[in-house]
A protein has these predicted regions:
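Transmembrane-cytosolic junction motif
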Residues: 3-27
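Charged, low-complexity intrinsically disordered regions
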Residues: 29-31, 37-228
Length: 228
């Protein structure tokens, strides 16, 4: 019975997968971009790891790659699933999800040369005494807390940078609302943004996305169009 169940499940899973890919490709064509189930992820993933944007993990998988150009800016969007795999004293393996959500990379129009990291308020806390850290070390760089002009932004986000002037130039007043709007669009949380190497990288935790095989293609398109 178990074998029969597996045999019956595989064609169903393959059919759902085929429907998902077909619908997502149609969504991509409709908005003038491309979609593929797999794609290049290593450089963006490593950039996020180097800047401590992910929780600790030892397994990673990526899917649902959207690429193209919007308003003259290249972009890449895909979903990451990061897990921690452990074994107990009896050798039994278990996996715990540490992060699931979209990774977005955009070719930025404003020229910049430093590194600026934007996180939700309190993401980097001092041990024991609490409060945000005055500086953090990531990717062999020291980023200092940046004092932003907009008090509402400071209440929601912490900004760390190795160029204070550039940080205030890049993170303009309405940026806070844009990040919060992205969180809402994906029903996500803990959004982070990184200005580095001439590109903007945004990640946030969210449930599995773009599963059009579940026949929620309209919602998938809404998420994608909002992001673009």
């Amino acid at each position: 019975a178990i074998g029969g169940g597996i045999w019956a499940y595989n064609p169903r899973a393959q059919a759902i997968k085929a429907v998902k890919v077909g619908i997502n490709q149609a969504i991509a064509r409709a908005v003038g971009i491309t979609y593929a189930e797999t794609g290049p992820s290593h450089d963006l993933y490593q950039r996020c790891c180097a800047h401590n944007m992910f929780p600790s993990h030892n397994r990673q998988a990526f899917e649902d790659f959207w690429t193209g150009e919007v308003a003259g800016h290249s972009f890449r969007l895909f979903e990451a699933h990061l897990q921690m795999e452990t074994k107990d004293s009896k050798g039994r393996t278990s996996r715990t999800t540490k992060f699931r959500g979209p990774l977005l990379e955009i070719g930025f129009s404003r020229k910049f040369h430093g590194t600026t990291l934007v996180t939700r308020d309190g993401a980097h806390r001092r041990f024991f005494i609490g409060g945000r850290k005055d500086s953090i070390k990531v990717a062999s760089k020291t980023l200092d807390i940046a004092e932003m002009v907009n008090p509402e932004f400071e209440d929601a986000f912490d900004v760390y940078s190795d160029d204070q002037v550039e940080a205030r130039y890049l993170v303009h007043p309405d940026y806070c609302e844009q990040l919060i709007a992205m969180e809402r669009a994906f029903a996500g949380k803990k959004v982070k943004a990184l200005f580095c190497e001439g590109k903007l990288t945004v990640i946030l935790e969210a449930k599995q996305l773009f599963e059009s095989g579940g026949m929620d293609a309209g919602r998938d398109r809404e998420k994608l169009e909002m992001t673009l």
